[in-house]
Amino acid sequence: MRVTWRTGPVAVTGASGQVGTALRRRLHQLPNQVRPLGRKDDLAAAFGDADAVVHHAGTLQPRKPNTYRAANLDTALATAAALARSPAQRVVFLSFLTARLDASNSYLRYKAEAEEALRSSGVPAVIFRCDHIYGPPDEPGPTASAFVAKSGRVMLLGSGTQRLAPLYREDVVEAILHAALDPATPTGTFQFAGPDTMSAEEFAHLLNSKPIRTRGTPVMLARLLGRVVPTLTPELVDVMLGDTVPTEDVAATARRFGVELHRLADVWRSQ
């Protein structure tokens, strides 16, 4: 028997980001009212009659005066506080695959603390611990854009041998929809990643249709660049230097949320 999806309003924090923008487009195909929210919006009012809340606020690359705590933890605390007075039946949160409460990296630590806050809100929560997310060729997103060649070259942080399982943006969007609106989907915390594990160098080659040259950056130099280059931070460099490889069956998780995972080579084949 087919379970009827929730048809009430869906509130989306951080709705202007890579995934939030795509999610809003997808939600507009459904009968649900979409409520995109920014930092200054009244969350309690927006959540007041919402069926579901999707918390996207957060960033690996905050711009001053924003901070890692303000962007990744304080926004989650505000969402959790507003949820406590809301009739919402689900809250969905995108965390990061290697988030840990004891992490020395403040981005990873605040992501883990944000998870705790949302689990404690009283609203059934679905938390996806995502690997690096990439978009299609016409909207690659910040991570993929860093691996697209300029003048035939790609500069890699570290040796390029670090491992990742990049996750397609539209697969994330579909999983969020099912988690938020389908009452039959489970709650809990789930690792979510793409179907193929590869090195950072292989990722770069798959994103570029023409032959490219890659050049690695020694780890110590990469960490120094994270402190002096305005577009980098120590936390971002640390994340990009590390492996992000799932230890759970992500294909099974995808199926539980109505998703058949896309392969990077197929998504970017037509570029």
Give, region by region, the residue ranges found by the protein language model:
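Amphipathic terminal alpha-helices
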Residues: R2-V3, V245-Q271
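SDR active-site strand-loop-helix element
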Residues: T13, H56-A57, V91-L97, F128-C130
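NAD(P)H-binding glycine-rich loop region in Rossmannoid oxidoreductase-like domains
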Residues: R39-A78, A82-R85, F96-L101
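A short helix->loop->beta-strand "cap" motif at the edges of active sites that frequently abuts
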Residues: S86-R90, V123
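Oxidoreductase cofactor-interface core, primarily capturing Rossmann-like NAD(P)-dependent enzymes
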Residues: A103-L207
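Terminal hydrophobic/aromatic helix or amphipathic segment near a protein terminus
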Residues: H205-V245
